[in-house]
Every structure is written in structure tokens, then in C-alpha cells.
Amino acid sequence: MHCAEAGKALIKFNHCEKYIYSFSVPQCCPLCQQDLGSRKLEDAPVSIANPFTNGHQEKCSFLLRPTQGTFLREYDGRSDLHVGITNTNGVVYNYSAHGVQRDGEGWEESISIPLLQPNMYGMMEQWDKYLEDFSTSGAWLPHRYEDNHHNCYSYALTFINCVLMAEGRQQLDKGEFTEKYVVPRTRLASKFITLYRAIREHGFYVTDCPQQQAQPPEGGGLC
């Protein structure tokens, strides 16, 4: 697993009336070869946050990763994704044809969606017990697994709705959860992957002043 890649940010700077992306600021502009040593404040490089995180460092979160390979290297935008829920120690509970798995590794390059607000101490204290009790119910035995209708996403969303119900909150269907919480982050991830691979191949990537993209809310828990 390429943990260093998962944490690597991209750099964007302006020159030649273009936006230039790279892993670091070069000494000279790759387009005109002019020295980049002195720039105006508004032309200062900015860091583009990496949308991927080590899922084992995330508490009480919903995680996504490719079923095979990693986002930055192998993912083609069409391959299957696998999802799971972390406990307070970063162990990833996920459902497959083998039943509920409790992974201590393998999710080092994931998209993470926090499920609790930072001040929800009561729920956090009970989280691990809720997750373990939920996972040992008969609904998630290996023979009940079905690729399209009773899968890893069903497992994760059903648990999320159990937590919402315990909190007296309205439950979410798959479409609502996906559109509100998953799609904004996967769109950002897709753009980051495109930039990352182009920079890895050519050393830099150039665009014409793109429109600023909306960011998903930071740190806001679902529950």
C-alpha cells in the first residue's frame, strides 16, 4: 500500500496566464523557463488537499476504497468500490461473501466520511459496542451475502440508519446518502486522480483558470 502517495498534496501556481499543477514548485516555469523565485502574493502557490486518507486513523467513519488496487494507481472510475465502517480504534468493519470482516490494515488510501459530530461523546463511547453487536446479528452471515442487494453498502447504510434511529434522527435511503455524502467526495477524488496521474507522467499539468469547485463540508458528521 502506497501510504506516502495517499498523503501527498498537489501544488497549484500561476504563470504564463495558466494554472500549473505539480508535486512541488519548480525553480523555473515549465512553459517559458522563466525563474519563479519572486512572485506577487496573489500568485503564491497553493496546496490542493489530498482527498484520500488512512482509514485506520479515522474514528467512527464511513470509508470507501477500490475493491482491487488503490485509487491513485489502479482505479479506472468504473471498477467496484468496497465500503466499511471504522470503530474508535480505526478497525474497519466491512461485509463481504466471507461475512463481516474486521480489518486492521488495507484501508490506508480511502475516502472518509465522518459519521459523528465531534461533541457526540455519549454516542462515541457506545459506538464500538453498537458496531460489534450489529455485526454479529444473523443478517450479516456469509451465506446471506448477495452482490446487488445485500452487500457491503447495505451493511454500512443499515448500521448508519440504526445509529440515526437511536438518536431520534430521520433515516436515509441509499440514494439520499449517496448524493449528499458520497458523490461530492468522489467527484473531488476523480479530479485529484486525473491531476495526480498527469503530473506523475509529465511532471506537471496545465489548465486555463478553471472555475473554483465547491468543497464538501469539513468535519461535519452525519449523525
Swiss-Prot record:
It comes from the Eukaryota. Coiled coil: none annotated. It holds the Pfam family DUF4796_C. This is MKRN2 opposite strand protein. It comes from Homo sapiens (Human). The gene is MKRN2OS.
